[in-house]
């Protein structure tokens, strides 16, 4: 595997998140309904847009991402963001899964008042993202300021017929979390 510095890997990961989750049209690619993009076309379009992108750099980002944000298709010809999409082009068909008793959501403390009023909503994304452990939730929340960890009564939600899914990188997904299912 080729050597790349941390900044180059982080910048490439952010670029891939942008085009594979939110704005594929920004560089002229099209994602299929499951979020897959042809790798050769992605590289070509990225280069035309002035981004340095190679298969070796993609391989390194996919292999070394601690959050496993991206995956390759079984034939190695396509790449996708595992979850976190806001583009209407994508509707990944995750299999419904029974969650553990509790899941966790990390957020910045400045969002707490709004969450206490409306619960957790997906916003521009397709799903609310939840973690199986508090440490991961804390890292997620810290990205936006002083973090607060919310406990989600996931099994109670599931018993009431509210569905959960789990992305291949372990992130739990649900459509919304009402205030009654949250512990502060």
Curated annotation (Swiss-Prot):
Q: What class of enzyme is it?
A: transferase
Keyword terms: NAD, Transferase
Q: Which GO terms describe its biological process?
A: tRNA splicing, via endonucleolytic cleavage and ligation
Q: What does the record give under GO molecular function?
A: NAD+ poly-ADP-ribosyltransferase activity; tRNA 2'-phosphotransferase activity
| EC number, as in UniProt | 2.7.1.-
Which Pfam families does UniProt cross-reference here?
PTS_2-RNA
Q: Per its UniProt entry, which superkingdom is the organism in?
A: Bacteria
* Family matches, as InterPro entries: Ptrans_KptA/Tpt1, RNA_2'-PTrans_C, RNA_2'-PTrans_KptA, RNA_2'-PTrans_N
Q: Which cysteines are joined by disulfide bonds?
A: none
For this chain, the family text in UniProt reads: Belongs to the KptA/TPT1 family.
Q: Its function?
A: Removes the 2'-phosphate from RNA via an intermediate in which the phosphate is ADP-ribosylated by NAD followed by a presumed transesterification to release the RNA and generate ADP-ribose 1''-2''-cyclic phosphate (APPR>P). May function as an ADP-ribosylase.
- What protein is this chain from? Probable RNA 2'-phosphotransferase
Lineage of the organism:
Bacteria, Pseudomonadati, Pseudomonadota, Gammaproteobacteria, Enterobacterales
Name of the coding gene:
kptA
